[in-house]
Amino acid sequence: MTDSFQRNHAYKRNGEIFDVSLFPKGMHRVALGIEYNGSLFHGFQSQVSGIATVQKTLESALTFICNEPIALVCAGRTDTGVHATNQVVHFDTHARRQEKAWLRGANAKIDDGVSIRWAQVVSPLFHSRFSARARTYRYIIYNTRTPSALMKNLVTWDRRRFHLDDMIEGSRSLLGAHNFHAFSGADCQAKTSIWRMAAIIVNTLGAFIVI
């Protein structure tokens, strides 16, 4: 291994690893599958103002049980009000725990609105963002004349009549590869802005339209 390779690929905590030998001894990479109610947080990413975010809540709990500062990397950041059922995150730590201990310990310290569904010690080569092969999003429309008080923060309500066949037909133009640069933020770190939409499924379930 050349000196230039080591300099260019030196270990950065939680960063992308290209050679296992560069991962510090005694360090472990842990992946988590998390679920959260986005209506209780101002998005995923920590913010300078200190307002409640998913990342801040999780890092606080993990820092406590690991007894060292923990920083998370997620597969993809979400905005205020966006929920997740299986968001993947990872972190590096010196702490050694059984996988069930990560679940019980962290969930006992996490605030309401966030839950860790699974935990797994993974290879240092794994990266929650760059190892992701695909992402799945679900949009739910509650299509009735009046809104629901119980589901206000869980679904989108719209009283207008939707034509399912037209929605399916229109969605076909979104399939395939597209350049999403216009939707990228100024600090976007993605390696490319071209992504492929593999499938769009539109179904109804009673008064719900699920996309």
Question: Where is each model-derived feature located?
Answer:
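Structured-RNA-binding interfaces characteristic of tRNA pseudouridine synthases
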Residues: 3-211
